[in-house]
């Protein structure tokens, strides 16, 4: 077998698509407090833009409440402004160096919109996985054409690629179902 075909690399790239999906799903608001909801918020701090988690500690003291402990007292206003301007529909309450953010419940229409976004993310992940599969199968076909592998090896490796694809698509589907359940939970 040629060094050009690497099943481990194909699996790693497919797992990368799943990791991206899980990160994207983690950012979807579900009505339940999660630090991942505001982690991507960037704050203007010390003359540059920094992620929120580099200027404050984010915690979840209650199921529908986030607490942001700002390390530098002078940064409280900038953190408050960054969270308000992040288009997340959140309004922090400032208490000294701590910002408390109540997570409002989602209405039915917003839940359905979130579910559609989750479906789109999942479909994007499936497409990425299929692209990786196609790349792997193209390499196998080229190796077969160049007579570097036998037909039997090509079929066996193609079957392994398909099995990895099926497993990764099943992982995407289970992540989507779990997120949908979380979104639709009242």
From Swiss-Prot:
Gene3D superfamilies with a match to the protein in the record: 3.30.1360.40, Ribosome-recycling factor
Tagged with keyword Ubl conjugation: no
Listed InterPro entries: Ribosome_recyc_fac, Ribosome_recyc_fac_dom, RRF_sf
A GO molecular function held by the record: ribosomal large subunit binding
Location of this chain's protein in the cell: Cytoplasm
Entry GO terms, CC: cytosol
Listed PANTHER family: MITOCHONDRIAL RIBOSOME RECYCLING FACTOR PSEUDO 1 (PTHR20982:SF3), RIBOSOME RECYCLING FACTOR (PTHR20982)
UniProt record similarity statement: Belongs to the RRF family.
Role of this protein: Responsible for the release of ribosomes from messenger RNA at the termination of protein biosynthesis. May increase the efficiency of translation by recycling ribosomes from one round of translation to another.
Protein name according to UniProt: Ribosome-recycling factor
Source organism of this protein record: Methylocella silvestris (strain DSM 15510 / CIP 108128 / LMG 27833 / NCIMB 13906 / BL2)
């Amino acid at each position: 077998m040629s060094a050009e075909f690497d099943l481990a690399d194909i699996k790693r790239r497919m797992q990368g698509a799943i990791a991206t999906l899980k990160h994207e799903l983690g950012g979807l608001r579900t009505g339940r407090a999660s630090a991942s909801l505001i982690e991507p918020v960037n704050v203007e701090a010390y003359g540059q833009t920094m992620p929120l988690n580099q200027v404050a500690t984010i915690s979840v003291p209650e199921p529908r409440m986030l607490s942001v402990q700002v390390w530098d007292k002078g940064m409280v206003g900038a953190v408050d402004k960054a969270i308000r301007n992040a288009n997340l529909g959140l309004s922090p309450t400032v208490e000294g160096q701590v910002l408390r953010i109540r997570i409002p419940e989602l209405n039915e229409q917003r839940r359905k919109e979130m579910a559609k976004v989750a479906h789109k993310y999942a479909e994007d992940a499936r497409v990425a996985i299929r692209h990786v599969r196609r790349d792997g199968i193209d390499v196998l076909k080229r190796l077969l054409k160049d007579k570097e592998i036998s037909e039997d090896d090509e079929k066996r490796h193609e079957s392994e690629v398909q099995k990895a694809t099926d497993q990764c698509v099943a992982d995407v589907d289970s992540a989507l179902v779990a997120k949908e359940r979380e979104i639709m939970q009242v």
